[in-house]
């Protein structure tokens, strides 16, 4: 039963997997393993907690999670190497957070005609600095964290005011409605499961959303908090402002979020840290998507294009999810700006290709 395997058993499985191409396999050398295998974080986390999922799922892309915020210090030898490779940065020099001046944003509605952009969404991940991540969290700690979070939700006012729905004991009607709204999160990811992400499911987990349903927070899904602002159309400014006001409100309520110098905001998976921000649009680009240069066009703009139902899904009706690729090494405002520039370039190219067909 490898689910409870020792660090030695996990290492043996990883070390013997010649075909494994994960970042964990690439960066956890024998020397690093020997230096880290007996260390513990202040939350009681171990190397085994960090690498379990990547050793059980040898087809992982990343293969390593941080067991808690302190893991980024205690296991920095391997985590820093993984972070540099994943985020394609030579050194870890993430700037201080900078959301920009909300009264002087460099963007507004990216598609006033409403012809191309179906919807716009910006989300961030945040972690409480006083709690561990899923592998080390007890059920009691998760429930206490949920209470701390709910107290912060009470501070939301105006358009952010809403209601919190715990997953545990949720009525069938609420479940059905949230599934239809695409708000509900599930426990069906094997990588996350083996990392401890679904321990004590579904206790201490829930969803907050405002009355207009254009702002929501996932509590204890993968990260402690995922704050999501979204709406139909292309008004990036409105979506971004709503999110920033929500983040500032939660911080002002007394919540303290985990950060580390050079890494920015810390998340369970090292692929999300830094700004921990993903800004995206669902956009109709059938002509651009059909062109052979589509991928390189997006790559040159630091834009990730994927199907509207998430990673590794196909487009539906020429609609693609376009988002900022970079999370680390730039400010929040710069990340959103980079997405804005990329989306506008895709929009211009789509119009040009459509006109050429006439």
Curated annotation (Swiss-Prot):
Keywords: ATP-binding, Kinase, Nucleotide-binding, Transferase. InterPro entries: ATP-guanido_PTrfase, ATP-guanido_PTrfase_AS, ATP-guanido_PTrfase_cat, ATP-guanido_PTrfase_N, ATP-guanido_PTrfase_N_sf, Gln_synth/guanido_kin_cat_dom. It is an enzyme of class 2 (transferase). PROSITE patterns: PHOSPHAGEN_KINASE, PHOSPHAGEN_KINASE_C, PHOSPHAGEN_KINASE_N. Residues 116-353 form the Phosphagen kinase C-terminal domain. One of its GO terms (cellular component) is extracellular space. Pfam families: ATP-gua_Ptrans, ATP-gua_PtransN. It comes from the Eukaryota. Residues 6-88 form the Phosphagen kinase N-terminal domain. Substrate binds at residues 61-65, 222, 269, 311. GO terms for biological process: phosphocreatine biosynthetic process. The keyword Nucleotide-binding applies. It catalyses: L-arginine + ATP = N(omega)-phospho-L-arginine + ADP + H(+). The keyword Nucleotide-binding applies. Gene3D superfamilies: ATP:guanido phosphotransferase, N-terminal domain, Glutamine synthetase/guanido kinase, catalytic domain. ATP binds at residues 119-123, 182, 226, 278-282, 306-311. Its EC number is 2.7.3.3. PANTHER family: ARGININE KINASE 1-RELATED, ARGININE OR CREATINE KINASE. Belongs to the ATP:guanido phosphotransferase family. This is Arginine kinase. It comes from Haliotis madaka. The lineage of its organism: Eukaryota, Metazoa, Spiralia, Lophotrochozoa, Mollusca.
